[in-house]
Regions:
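Conserved alpha/beta-hydrolase "acid-adjacent" motif
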Residues: 180-190
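Cap/lid segment of the alpha/beta-hydrolase catalytic domain
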Residues: 1-12
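Gly/Ala-rich beta-loop-alpha elbow adjacent to hydrolase catalytic centers
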Residues: 40-45, 49
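Conserved acidic catalytic loop of the alpha/beta-hydrolase fold
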Residues: 16-35
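Alpha/beta-hydrolase-fold enzymes
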Residues: 49-136
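Active-site nucleophile elbow and catalytic-triad environment of alpha/beta-hydrolase enzymes
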Residues: 137, 141-163
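Short beta-strand/loop motif that positions the catalytic acidic residue
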Residues: 173-175
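Catalytic histidine neighborhood in serine/cysteine hydrolases
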Residues: 192-207
Length: 207
């Protein structure tokens, strides 16, 4: 409402977003009883969906994870520390060029020479241009969002948390094989294997 984008909350933003997802699930269940409910999450939304599957097992009929991944634990820990320090310096809704450059900027460096700052998003140049022209898409996110997301990535990587998922909930993974969020496919395979190791019986992967 204050015109600033890319910030969840001063504290516990990740859990608050997952609570919103659960609230919407309950609302839709009341409006449409008996209708199968599938949860789709893309990119950061896939991380939130994975958190939801841990915190609210057995409450959806299936999950679709698009463009997911899992960065190495030391890198995630460093990202959380850096974003947290920048949060103290700039405030929870502040924007850090350093954090942005080390995160999303690193994705684009894989596609040099670059035509735009968002070449990594798609092979389709028209879609990249449309993204950059949309003020609701091309803004830089807050340091607290990065801090919260790094904490979320730590949470969804822990074996004891993965073990809380409903093993019978079908999960479909799909991603571009050149998507840096998924480590050019390697991170997607890693998460797929993590779900299998956690006992999930119905997981499918498409690159």
């Amino acid at each position: 409402q204050d015109g600033r984008y890319g910030a969840f909350a001063p504290q516990n933003g990740w859990k608050l977003v997952v609570a919103d997802i659960a609230r919407l699930r309950r609302i839709q269940g009341e409006k449409h009883p008996g209708v199968p409910y599938f949860l789709l999450g893309h990119s950061m939304g896939s991380f939130l969906t994975r958190t939801y599957l841990i915190d609210h097992p057995g409450t959806v009929d299936g999950a679709i994870l698009s463009g997911t991944g899992q960065e190495p634990a030391p890198l995630v820990a460093f990202g959380k520390l850096l974003a947290g320090l920048e949060c103290r310096r700039l405030g929870y809704d502040g924007v850090s060029p350093l954090v942005d450059r080390l995160s999303l900027g690193a994705y684009n460096r894989r596609f040099r020479p670059n035509r735009t700052s968002a070449d990594w998003l798609s092979r389709d140049e028209e879609q990249v241009d449309a993204y950059l022209a949309d003020p609701l898409c091309s803004h830089k996110s807050s340091v607290s969002m990065f801090r919260d997301m790094m904490g979320g990535l730590q949470y969804i990587a822990r074996r004891e948390n993965l073990a809380r998922m409903d093993p019978d909930t079908p999960v479909y993974f799909f991603s571009g094989d050149q998507d840096p969020v998924g480590g050019m496919g390697k991170g997607v395979h890693k998460v797929y294997a993590m779900f299998q190791a956690a006992g999930c019986r119905d997981v499918t992967l498409k690159l």
